[in-house]
Curated annotation (Swiss-Prot):
Effect the entry attributes to changing T468 to A/E: Loss of kinase activity. Loss of kinase activity
Protein name stated in the entry: Somatic embryogenesis receptor kinase 1
Membrane topology (UniProt): Single-pass type I membrane protein
Biological source species: Arabidopsis thaliana
Phosphoserine, modified sites: S291, S299, S303, S352, S383, S386, S394, S415, S478, S483, S606, S612, S622
Domain Protein kinase: 302-589
Gene name of the encoded protein: SERK1
């Protein structure tokens, strides 16, 4: 007995300092965030849960922590906040994502943000920040995304930023910056888009020479090469020998110079690039233009063994570039039309400007007279659909925390497409197969922007319905009219895929006299109060029933028959974060009860899809607790 007591005392002495350290860390981070809350004006009570009496800020909405209860993410984008930032944010040593975009925050950017050495993404765009960009931000050695555009920042661009070798995306446009734009280090990768609309910036990338520097020489005019015959497998039906010879003569000097330069860089490769047709007036952002030959080699001649998937837009191939980087090459199938090259370049530019951690980032493109290809990073963990239904026995199933993270991440990506792209982008084919998973199983929305881009109108009528059966919103299928709410419907079905593990449309369910449409099948089980039967068997009982019910509630709100009644994706994000779901669900229940009482007839245009859009009794699920 005495020895047991001694062991207990020793363990207490060992563990108590660690516990004290954790409390101290949590208190510091909580105090810093509460200080931020005090200085911000919050008209929508977004920060209501930031209670200083709670030691651990990990319980607060819009705050994410790691397993050690350290804050790693603060998400307060598009929250209508005003006020200013506080230097105390510098104590969040493990913070990776600071998202404060699209608010009305004023004042300077605190130099203490340079202490956040684990920061990966700093998004302060679309605010009213003033003053200089802190030199201390150059210490953020892990930073990949730095977006300070659309503020009122002044002064010069700190040279220290060029030392951030990990920097992939930089946007300083639409400010009041002045002086020379650095062109060394990581800044050598960036194009005029990163610095646009800063009238007092100068340097080669801005096309405004700095005082005392020689004027820029305009580039020589580009001579369009004639079509060159290629192997018949790529659809060229012939070429005129004289034209080829003339084209070769005209372009002799350019390929020779390119070849000599290329040989100095890559002496072991056996192919070289020739100039491709390109409109010099179209800027393509921070994109690499690949040659067709380069992508042919990377994919082993677009071999069938390298096919990752097939879809309505074409096939996707796995490829390995000359430097060893794995990529996914999407080979688009489309009819060639007059002016199609310019349209393709314009759409590629729009896609490239949609940069968010939950969106699949376009790495480059290839355009020839016969081919259109897009190059993306390779996602080793595949898609949500493959992880749910096609995983090998050696791969563990997606657990419930991962599924929740996928739901929230994909919602954030779609919200960015709808609310922060100009023009906004409507996906039109949201489904589990188009939600990819990176190395950390973070959701990455793919295949966006491949349908026609939205203009500034609220809706767009297309000549062909894009999408997958089971995911298509009823109004889109019947009228061809799409909007953001079309994506919301598809997202709701994707949530049901996450919960059930099943396909959105599956004829195999007929064997059990079940509905082939996943939405109808789920509603049928809910009417029979068989919640446990719709849960993916791979989850077993390893999930929180309350959280499961809340995700189902969000899915049902997203799949309402009327697009006007569906929430926006930004509202979906807030509901998944725990903000506003109870009110939305209660409001929806009242509407459903009213429909039953007055026997409200459904829209006659939607009679055929009645089971998928109406008549779910309001008592199927308990409200949020």
């Amino acid at each position: 007995m005495e020895s047991s007591y001694v062991v207990f005392i020793l363990l207490s002495l060992i563990l108590l300092p660690n516990h004290s350290l954790w409390l101290a860390s949590a208190n510091l981070e909580g105090d810093a965030l509460h200080t931020l809350r005090v200085t911000l004006v919050d008209p929508n009570n977004v920060l209501q849960s930031w209670d200083p009496t709670l030691v651990n800020p990990c319980t607060w909405f819009h705050v994410t922590c790691n397993n050690e209860n350290s804050v790693i993410r603060v998400d307060l984008g598009n929250a209508e906040l005003s006020g200013h930032l506080v230097p105390e944010l510098g104590v969040l040593k493990n913070l990776q994502y600071l998202e404060l975009y699209s608010n009305n925050i004023t004042g300077p950017i605190p130099s203490n943000l340079g202490n956040l050495t684990n920061l990966v993404s700093l998004d302060l765009y679309l605010n009213s920040f003033s003053g200089p960009i802190p030199e201390s931000l150059g210490k953020l050695s892990k930073l990949r995304f730095l977006r300070l555009n659309n503020n009122s920042l002044t002064g010069s661009i700190p040279m220290s930023l060029t030392n951030i070798t990990t920097l992939q995306v930089l946007d300083l446009s639409n400010n009041r910056l002045s002086g020379s734009v650095p062109d060394n280090g990581s800044f050598s990768l960036f194009t005029p888009i990163s610095f646009a609309n800063n009238l007092d910036l100068c340097g080669p990338v801005t096309s405004h020479p700095c005082p005392g520097s020689p004027p820029f020489s305009p580039p020589p005019p580009f001579i369009q090469p004639p079509p060159v015959s290629t192997p018949s497998g790529y659809g060229i039906t012939g070429a005129i020998a004289g034209g080829v010879a003339a084209g070769a003569a005209l372009l002799f000097a350019a390929p020779a110079i390119a070849f000599a330069w290329w040989r100095r860089r890559k002496p072991l490769d056996i192919f070289f690039d020739v100039p491709a047709e390109e409109d010099p007036e179209v800027h393509l952002g921070q994109l690499k233009r690949f040659s067709l030959r380069e992508l042919q080699v990377a994919s082993d001649g677009f071999s069938n063994k390298n096919i990752l998937g097939r879809g309505g837009f074409g096939k996707v191939y796995k490829g390995r570039l000359a430097d060893g980087t794995l990529v996914a090459v999407k080979r688009l199938k489309e009819e060639r039309t007059p002016g199609g090259e310019l349209q393709f370049q314009t759409e590629v530019e729009m896609i490239s400007m949609a940069v968010h951690r939950n969106l699949l980032r376009l790495r480059g493109f290839c355009m020839t007279p016969t081919e259109r290809l897009l190059v993306y990073p390779y996602m080793a963990n595949g898609s949500v659909a493959s992880c749910l239904r096609e995983r090998p026995p050696s791969q563990p199933p997606l657990d419930w925390p991962t599924r929740k993270r996928i739901a929230l991440g994909s919602a954030r990506g779609l919200s960015y497409l709808h609310d922060h792209c100009d023009p906004k982008i409507i996906h039109r084919d949201v489904k589990a197969a188009n939600i990819l998973l990176d190395e950390e199983f973070e959701a990455v929305v793919g295949d966006f922007g491949l349908a026609k881009l939205m203009d500034y109108k609220d809706t767009h009528v297309t000549t062909a319905v894009r999408g997958t059966i089971g995911h298509i919103a009823p109004e889109y299928l019947s009228t061809g009219k799409s909007s953001e709410k079309t994506d919301v419907f598809g997202y709701g079905i994707m949530l049901l895929e996450l919960i059930t593990g099943q396909r959105a449309f599956d004829l195999a369910r007929l064997a059990n006299d079940d509905d082939v449409m996943l939405l109808d099948w789920v509603k049928g089980l809910l009417k029979e109060k068989k919640l446990e039967m719709l849960v993916d068997p791979d989850l077993q009982t390893n999930y929180e029933e309350r959280e499961l019910e809340q995700v189902i509630q969000v899915a049902l709100l997203c799949t309402q028959g009327s697009p006007m009644e569906r929430p926006k994706m930004s509202e979906v994000v807030r509901m998944l974060e725990g903000d506003g779901l109870a009110e939305k669900w209660d409001e929806w229940q009242k509407v459903e009860i009213l429909r039953e009482e007055i026997d409200l007839s459904p829209n006659p245009n939607s009679d055929w899809i009645l089971d998928s859009t109406y008549n779910l009794h309001a008592v199927e699920l308990s409200g949020p607790r």
